[in-house]
Amino acid sequence: AASDVYKRQQLNQAQLAKTLFPIGGLQKSEVRNIAAEQGLVTAEKRDSQGLCFVGKVSLPDFLQQKLATKKGDIVQVANTHPMYAKTPENTPASLAEKFVYSPEDGNVVGTHNGAHFFTVGQRKGLAVGGTKEPLFVLATDVQKNIIYVGEGKDHPGLYRRALWIDQADVHWIRPDLQTDQPMMVQARIRYRQPLAKARLHQEENGMYLVFDTPQSAIAAGQFAAWYLDNELIGSGVIG
């Protein structure tokens, strides 16, 4: 069953001290049964998907209503590009380093209506055919309005082992566990993603989160959350 614990990642102890979760120990099916017994109309309501507050409209459509469209190129980068052959040093900084793309790194395979409508790892909405496997967004250049894509979910440009969080964006739900020493945790970088083994490395101006195995589609601006024994203890905005 899905857990909403990840969504509580920015709360603090003062807030949690006065918060009750009366159905926190129940499965979703049990809650629906109780609602049905009480005659609540929401008992059979479908689960919400995406952003609840935008109403009955998809997120891309919602954004296009609010943001101006602007034509730009979609550049496909081959899986065999030389940049992917380089082995990073086994340091947090090197493992967290992002691939830097330029138009010369690939071929233009289509156009889009605005790089700001796309995010790393996105597959839908590209409207580019002719490939054996689906295309995924590797990176977006909002300044130049270019989207870089790669073919297949195993494209090396999708994967990194580490990420960086600026100190101002580091939030400890359990500040008593904060430490300057490397700390073994479990972590996730998106809602409902399985927890993965990782290490926290505190630096003077921020923190590295280094996973044991490469993670797909680490997107700047999203939240990373870390756990101890399935307890959510901290989070931060990915830089």
Describe the predicted segments one by one.
Residues 10-19:
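Acidic/polar active-site rim loop that often engages polyanionic ligands
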Residues 24, 29-171:
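Anionic-ligand-binding alpha/beta catalytic cores of soluble enzymes and soluble regulatory domains
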Residues 141-233, 238-239:
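Basic, glycine-rich polyanion-binding accessory segments appended to enzymes
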Residues 2-6:
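Short, small-residue-biased leader/transition segments that mark boundaries at the very start
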Residues 7-11, 40-41:
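Short, flexible, solvent-exposed loop/turn segments with mixed acidic/basic and small polar residues
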Residues 15-16, 70, 133, 181-183:
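Residue-level preference for short coil/turn positions at secondary-structure junctions
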Residues 19-25, 207-210:
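General secondary-structure propensity
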